[in-house]
Amino acid sequence: MSGGVSLGSIGQIANGQPSGHPKGLFYLSFTEMWERFSFYGMSALLTLYMVKELLLPENASHVVGLAALRNMFEFRGPMSDVAFSAIIYGWYAGLVYFTPMVGGWVADRILGAKRTVMIGVVLMSAGHLAMSFYASFLFALLLLILGSGFLKGNISAQVGALYPRSDESLRSRGFTIFSTGICIGAASGPLVTG
């Protein structure tokens, strides 16, 4: 029948989107793409920035808490700027992947996934803004770590919650779109920033 509605278009009409996916999928995919852009862009630049700019004597003295942190890591003796910056990067990367457990707990027990993701986005934005100033460098890293922890696991849970459990095929395609956003952010972060 030429005037009828096809079964394929029922999902599209029900979701209100031409793609058949909920509108929220594209917002969540875009947000996660930028989170991965942030992490991999920082990964490409953090050690280089610290060695070539931040750890220069005239700049390092302005970073709040940097001397104390360096003293803590130099308990076995002095280390080069490269070694110190590599340690900072290692802690940053490790904590970015550890804190989603904390973010998941906060979402499950206190705030809910949506609020936790929003707080994560705000923390990461504030962290990148704070990176603009030498004095707040370590505080900026802390904000980025916490923001990523609040966002990382909870945003995936939100994607899953967009779809009814009865439509695994559409849900699977939605996660493919979401994963594509992750890959685009991860690939473009180091290329654009570095």
Language-model segment annotations:
Residues 1-42:
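Cytosolic juxtamembrane N-terminal segment immediately preceding the first transmembrane helix
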Residues 25, 82-83, 166-178:
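Loop-to-transmembrane helix entry/capping segments in MFS-fold secondary transporters
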Residues 44, 101-102, 184-194:
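A gly/Pro-rich, aromatic-decorated transmembrane alpha-helix motif that marks the paired
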Residues 86-106, 152:
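Central cavity-lining transmembrane alpha-helices of secondary-active solute carriers
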Residues 96, 172-191:
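Glycine-rich segments within core transmembrane alpha-helices of 12-TM secondary carriers
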Residues 109-121, 171:
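Cytoplasmic membrane-interface "Motif A"-like loop-to-helix N-cap segments
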Residues 119-139:
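C-terminal ends and interior cores of transmembrane alpha-helices
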Residues 150-165:
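Intracellular juxtamembrane helix-capping segments at the cytosolic ends
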